[in-house]
Curated annotation (Swiss-Prot):
This is Putative 8-amino-7-oxononanoate synthase. Pathway: Cofactor biosynthesis; biotin biosynthesis. Belongs to the class-II pyridoxal-phosphate-dependent aminotransferase family. BioF subfamily. The gene is bioF. It catalyses: 6-carboxyhexanoyl-[ACP] + L-alanine + H(+) = (8S)-8-amino-7-oxononanoate + holo-[ACP] + CO2. It is an enzyme of class 2 (transferase).
């Protein structure tokens, strides 16, 4: 039908811009995996602590299936609520030091459902320009007036507050804690100060901070010592926690309100028993000890120090640049989408899977590297050698 002819043309445009994407089959979640038939060292996983392959999570998931079955069978407000959901929510709240928490079936649903429940067309959203797509889409769906401020630019944010805050009923400040395509952290203490000064709510997305940052791995809020601030703390169960799902932690009134007004929680099937149990086991493991986080940060430091030397910014001929990072996400910026695709393929030819990230996902093309606690030092060394060879040939 002619009504669908535009799709082929749109795909051709995507191909021409070097923006085309396709899925790759990965055999397992570990640091070494088989990718489309090739054994590779995996530097693309968000499984920062290596828990997705941990036998303790698998045993917890199997036990939950034996007790509750494979599915939750309904929405949480109807037939889909299980005691294990409550146990996970209590564990998250204790870990995050909030009054309570609510678990969603994915992090994406948590962001969309929370934002659209809190603000509407009478309200204002001020958001970091580098926020995750789920935050951006939640903002659009809310109908609120949206203004983005330059990445981590609190001066620009304050100017927007001075200009627009008084014209709207409510204001929601929205930010990632760890920016997933850059690896840097939000200026949380400054954001909290502005939220208090201008009577704003503040939502912080801890997707890539949960399990990784802070003394107990509770995230960026703990890392900055801001646990006493009144915040809306969102996070995922699918990255460092090695399972699936999302959560929001905060005051009892906030969570009670979300149970009654958050459409993406009300009108979807509850998180499966297996995923819930695996996430609960992960929270307990992370809270009980810091060994995995210590291993992770050793590997991050090893790679960062080497790349800082090999990708020296003072080299005028160097086309690869290590972007600032305070997390297990390290990004090597390259000049064009074509260049980053070539570099990623060269790494793959050497058995290194580090994906090319291109516009429109990010403003500039880059190789995105994710470090896991289960990576061995020798695997980090292999990556360093491979990146150095790519840099020399670029």
């Amino acid at each position: 039908m002619a009504a669908y002819d535009w799709i082929e043309s749109a795909l051709a445009t995507v191909h021409k811009a070097n923006w085309y994407r396709s899925v790759k089959t990965m055999s397992s979640p570990g640091p070494t995996a088989v990718l489309n038939g090739q054994t590779v060292i995996n530097f693309a996983s968000n499984d920062y602590l290596g828990l997705a392959g941990d036998s303790r999570l698998a045993e917890a998931a199997i036990a939950a299936i034996n007790t509750y079955g494979t599915g939750s069978t309904g929405s949480r407000l109807l037939s889909g609520h299980r005691m294990i959901h409550e146990q996970l929510e209590r564990a998250i709240a204790t870990w995050k030091q909030t009054e309570t928490a609510i678990v969603y079936s994915s992090g994406y649903l948590a962001n969309i459902g929370t934002i659209t429940a809190l603000v509407n067309k009478r309200d204002l959203i001020l958001a970091d320009a580098y926020n995750h797509a789920s935050l951006k889409n939640g903002a659009r769906l809310s109908g609120a007036t949206i203004h983005e401020f330059g990445h981590a630019n609190v001066t620009e944010l304050q100017t927007l507050l001075e200009t627009h805050r008084s014209h709207h009923r409510r204001c929601l400040l929205v930010t990632d804690s760890v920016f997933s395509m850059d690896g840097d952290l939000c200026p949380l203490p400054e954001l909290i100060a502005l939220a208090e000064q201008y009577d704003c709510m503040l939502l912080i997305d801890e997707a890539h901070g949960t399990g990784v940052l802070g003394k107990t791995g509770a995230g960026c809020v703990e890392h900055f010592g801001c646990r006493d601030a009144e915040l809306i703390q969102m996070g995922t169960l699918s990255k460092a926690l090695g399972s699936l799902g999302g959560y929001v932690a905060g005051s009892a009134s906030l969570i009670d309100y979300l149970r009654n007004r958050s459409s993406s929680w009300i009108y979807t099937t509850g998180l499966s028993p297996a995923d819930t149990a695996a996430a609960l086991a992960a929270v307990e493991i992370i809270r009980e000890g810091s060994e995995l986080r210590s291993q992770l940060w050793q590997r991050v430091t090893q790679l960062k120090q080497a790349l800082t030397t090999h990708l020296a910014p003072e080299d005028e001929h160097q086309t690869m640049q290590l972007l600032p990072s305070e997390s297990p996400i390290l990004c090597v910026q390259m000049p064009t989408p074509a260049a980053v695709l070539t570099a990623s393929q060269q790494l793959l030819d050497q058995g290194i899977f580090a994906p090319a990230i291109r516009p429109p996902t990010v403003p500039t093309s880059r190789i995105r590297i994710s470090i896991m606690a289960t990576h061995q030092a020798v695997q980090i060394d292999q990556l360093i050698v491979a990146l150095s060879e790519v840099a020399q040939g670029s």
